[in-house]
Amino acid sequence: MSTIFVRRLTAPSESNLYYIKTTKGGYNKCIQIKPNGSVLPNCVGYAWGRYCEEQNIHSCNLSRGDAGNWYYKNDGYSRGRIPKLGAVICWSKDGGAGHVAIVEKIYSNGKILTSNSAYNGSRFFKETLNPPNYSRGTRYHFQGFIYPDTDFIDPDTPIPTIETPKTKFKWVLYAKKFRNRNIM
């Protein structure tokens, strides 16, 4: 079954359990960064939490180690080089840890919008990246995408309209509660 994708375009709240360590009452199994239990700022903690959040699950099999190793980990998820909503995008990095982020939007020209966090950097930020290699600079090397188990529908997709012949009344198939749902 398909689900309408809910984009994250702002930082998660400090109380969002997807970004709080399990030992502090949250759902996240990644390394704790802040004394309050937050796993942010860290790309691994963010991507792990966001992947679970978007699918409304409390745990997943994604790696919790170096982001540069995520793409080649045998975790049971499908992979590829074509972006999908909610997918984890993975990069390795020359001489250091890689980076992971989440695909929040795919534009008609092939560009993608990602949501991110960075270890010792920003708690939350967005990037627009260009195909085919979705470059983050010369030291990062695009590996591919780890796909979510959920088949997401883009919230910008036009909504089908059904017109009944007798009444000429248009019935709109509308998922308002999903489109207007705010993520904390």
Question: What are the language-model segments listed below?
Answer:
Residues 1-120:
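Secreted/periplasmic proteins that engage bacterial cell-wall peptidoglycan
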Residues 6-7, 106-171, 175, 184:
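Aromatic- and glycine-rich peptidoglycan recognition patches
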